[in-house]
Each structure stands twice: as structure tokens, then as C-alpha cells.
Amino acid sequence: MKRFAALSLAALMLLTVFASAASAVDVIEIRGPVYNGSDIDDIIDTYGDGTILTMDATDFAAFYYDIDDNVTTETLSIEDVPDTEGNVIGEGGLIYETTIQEVEYEYYNPDAGWDNYSLMGFFAEKYIPINPDKADKLSKLILDSDDKYTIRTGEMLDLGEGYAIEAKQVDVDGEKVWLEFTKDGEFVDDEIISVSTADDEANTWDVELDDIEDEDDVIVLKVHVNQVFQGAVDSIAQIEGLWLIDYANAMTIESDDEFGNLDDVSIDGDTLTITNEDTFTLTRDDEEEIGEGLYFATADTPSNVLRFYAMKEITDPGTYEIRGQVASGFGDQSWDASSFAGFYYDIDDNVSTETLTVSDLDGNVIPEGGLVYTTTIADVDFEYYNPDAGWDQYPVMGFFAEEYIPINPDKADKIAKLVLDSDDKYTIRTGEMLDLGEGYAIEAKQVDVDGEKVWLEFTKDGEFVDDEIISVSTADDEANTWDVELDDIEDEDDVVVLKVHVNQVFQGAVDSIAQIEGLWLIDYANAMTIESDDEFGNLDDVSIDGDTLKISNEDTFTLTRDSEEEIGEGMYFMIADTSSSDLRYYPYVEKTIGEEVSGEEETPEETPTGEVTETEGEEETPTEVTETPTEGEPAPEETETTESEGTTPGFGFMFGLVGLLAVVYLVRRNN
């Protein structure tokens, strides 16, 4: 029995530790243009032509776009059909359309058979039509790369989604390589590729398969081998040029298919059109699915105001590019949060703070002072909006597409990153810790149910910062809030760095529990002061005027064609590969979900590497993640707990495990 007790206690201790660990649910939102008016008719009149309003990849950053070829395939339109009024789109008035287009391979080499391929955006993902003239049979594009890879005899190159190629043999003398293509470890095809011939096309292996959605001779993989050579130890093949589709998960779209709220499917050759058979309501203060991960986000406004945007939610780990509206030509350009999805925006309060302008272009050169980034402090509502409890508004300032809080609400020179602004409910037991992100945490030192109090302790990287006993018995709702004020934050005193609102304390089945609703936190430990001589990438002329920060370029800034040029602090211009008579570019930032994935490093021809485990995914680029706290066990029925995703292991599981150990003990004793 002592042994069982020890095991049970160990299990309890282990699970208590795990219960305190945070588990962030990371989401990237890529939004389209912001539409603001009195009702849907007013918006169609203002932003459309009075009959129809259309967005495409040049202004909706989620849609597929090829800047070099200036290729878009997708549009989303709202048409003023009957019953389109107020906040309602009538039947057939919400129209998603996509058309097959030709784009160049990343490894562009027409002599080797690498010129163009057919592509179609499908709900903001890149798909390949199995038949290049018909839009009904699609397979997702996994890989289109011109990076160099080296692969040794017996080595495998992971292509993603379970696909791989292996170098079975590398014959340096014969200038050949034997490659094998597999899916989930199962053989698919193999080929001996010769690189000795003058015919560059012979260096390419096209894997063609039959019966892909009833289509034959479908190219599913293209591999171009540059050369084979003898390394210090191994025989090595160098690959430059990889293209792959996910043929194992190809699909055929039927006329009776449904995609979210889009359920009227029409296929006309190379064009796919899907509309709504039923009316579509833009419900205020809500997100309504359009289809396949596309949504409309609608602001919490009175009935005489309608404000919304289309957006794509991404939850898969990886790196993603969030771009602004595409600029074309040599005229002046400007972006704000309505035209650059990377900039900070609060749809409910219609608050944006950042602008980026380009003026007086000379060809592709921006003169001194012609590139200007400006941001101004604005007030927004707390997510937990409760003015009676001291939760009304706080000052915010976008800073290079990140959300920052001014230490002094009237001055833009001292800022700290916003870590958390949440109205979710969390339960926390005596001795339990709630991870707030970035090393910050709060712990319930004691929960006094009879006295209706909770003793909370605030820590940073495990070190004590402050503590407070919060009473929830008073009728004064503001007394339920703990404001942690610290001094000497960038030479400022009485700075509120954390706000916690405690709803109630109650007795659970075993533990005393406090319920928190309302959390707000800034990263004060990494606050910064912006000086007039600071430099931010190519922006180095800093001007601070009260609540406004302006940074411009002291030197000329060249929009070099076919390149990416840093603006500052992770913000870039992407410039198309065009002729000198044309100029096309957009600003972008990169966001990351999960652990940051390092980019591919090209292997110089003279020094090939043995690393071949890297895989190039589609449209993924580095990004920042805002961590959110983990919720504990749901409260009793009378208290609603939100955000079921990302919860910590519940105590029900813990006691279930202890019960299981008890059963094991009793069975063994009886035996």
C-alpha cells in the first residue's frame, strides 16, 4: 500500500507541474481591405461600382499572387443582388471565382523543360489542375524550388507531406545518379539520370503517374540534377530544380459540393465559380465563414454602421508572408492598416496608427526623405471591457507591424510590447501557476473561499515581482482588479505593467479555485526608449513629436528589381523582376507560428553540404508569435470558460490516472 501511495503522490506532483505549463494557440490572420459604411449597399457604392465590389490578390494578401508575372487567379465579390441590404448579402451575391493561369517555375530553364506550369489559387492556397484546361480536378502544390541541394549515395531528401527522393547510387565516372521516389516510405518510381549529355532536358526527371482522379500521364514530380562529383568521402549529386504536387490527396470538385457558406458550384473550363444559395449575414462582433478557412470579420458597431474585412486564418506551424497592396508604376504610394494587412488594426474601434509612404520616385530610386514611416498613439478598448472595474481603454501604438504600449501615454518615445490582452476565463488553484508568456506568470499562493479572497504572486522568469491579496466580496467591482505598478521603467514611475481581474473564488471537488476574467500585460522587462539618432534598417532619420513617431530615410533608397529590400525592423519591400520601363512592388512582414524554421541555405557548387533534411514549403516566412495563457479546468456550470483550445491537462485526467493506479494495485493484491 505504501508503494501505491508513493506512486499516486508522484503522479499528482507530476501532473500538477504539467497543469501549470502554458500551451499557446497560435493564429495568424491575413486580412483584406477594410470596408466601412452605413450598410452593405453604401459599401458597394463607395468601394465598388454601385453594382459589385471585388477584391483580388493585389489588395487581399491571402490570395495567391505572383509578383514577377503579375498573376492573380482568385477574386471575391459582393454583388448588389435582390435582398442585399443592411448587413445581409442576398442569394448569389457572394461570389468566389478562380481561373487557371500560367506561371514560371522557380527554377526557370526552358531548355531543360522548366518554363511554365498551370496553377490556380483555391481559397488562398496554391493548387495545380490535374488537367491544365479544367478547373475541377486539383492537387495542392507542395514544392516549387530553385534552391540547390546535395545528396549522397543512400541519403534521402525529404520533400514534405511524406514524399521523398533517395540517391540509390551516384556514379561519378559515368556521370549518372539513380534516384528513387517514395511516398510514406513506399516505392513510387525510380530513374537513372545522366548529366553527361549536352541535352539539358535529359538532366530532368519527370515522374508521370496514371489514374490521378481518373487522369493519366500526370506529372507529379520534376527533379533537375545539375551535376555529380566526388566529395572528400562520398559520391554526391547536386539537385537544382524541384517541383512536386500532393497527388495522393488530389480532389475532384463536383457541382453539388459545399465549401462553408458557398454551395452553388459552377465549372466552366478553366474557371471555377462558387456562390451562396442562401442569404449571408455579416453578423456584428463575429466572424462568419465564407469557405475553406476564409472568413468575414465584422466589427462590433451600432446598427447604422457596418465595418468588415475578409480574412484568412492560418494555424499550421510555419512562416508566412503578410503583404500590403501592390504598387504599380512610378507615382507616389501610401499604405495604412486598411491596405497593408501587416499593420496593427482594431476593427471594433476602427483604430490604426501606422502609415508608410513613398514619394518623388526617380525611376526606381526613392530620394532622401521620400520613404516615411509614421505611427501615432491611439486609444483602444480592453478586450475585457468593464469601465466600472477600471477596464475601459488603454493607449496603443503599432511599431513596425507589432503592437506596442507607450510607457507614457502622451509620448511615443518609450514603448513596451503588448504580451496579452484577453477577456478569456481561466481557473487557477492554490499553488497553481498561469503562464502569461515571455517568462511572465501569476501563481495562486492561497485561495480563501470563505473570505472570498485570493493571494496572487506575479513573477518574471521565476523571480518575484509583486503580490496582492484580492477580495471579490466587495460590491466595488474595481476592487476585484489588481494593477501591478512598477517604477523606473525607462525612467518612468507608476507604470501599470499587468492588470488582472478576478471574477470569483469557489470550492471545487477537491481544491479552492479562483476564476480570472481579464488579463493585460506588457513586456516591461524589454521596454525601449527611441532616440533621435537611432536607426531602423534603412530608416534612420527619427523625429518624435509628442504622441507621433516619424522615421524617414537619410540616404536614397533603391527599389532594386527582382529583390527584397529591408525598410526596417523586419519590414521589407518585395520588388518584381520587371523591365526598366515598369515598376511593381509591395511592403511585407513575416510572421511565424510555432518554432521558427530556419530558411534554406543554398549550397555553393564548390562546397556541397551533406544537409538535405530541409524542405521548402509553400509561401511560408518567419513571424512573431504572441503567446496566450493556458486555461485550467473549466469552472462549475454557472461560470462559463471560453477558449477550449490550448487548455492545460485537466485535473479530471489527473484523478483518472490515480484511479487507474488504484485499480492496478487492487488487482495485483487480489492475485
From Swiss-Prot:
Top-level taxon: Archaea
Compartment(s) of residence: Secreted, Cell wall, S-layer; Cell membrane
Record PTM text: Glycosylated.
Record bears the keyword Mitochondrion: no
Biological process according to GO: cell wall organization
Keywords assigned by UniProt, alphabetized: Cell membrane, Cell wall, Cell wall biogenesis/degradation, Glycoprotein, Membrane, S-layer, Secreted, Signal, Transmembrane, Transmembrane helix
GO cellular component, one term: extracellular region
Biological function: S-layer protein. The S-layer is a paracrystalline mono-layered assembly of proteins which coat the surface of the cell.
NCBIfam families attached to this UniProt entry: PGF_CTERM (TIGR04126), S_layer_rel_Mac (TIGR01567)
Name by which UniProt lists this protein: Major S-layer protein
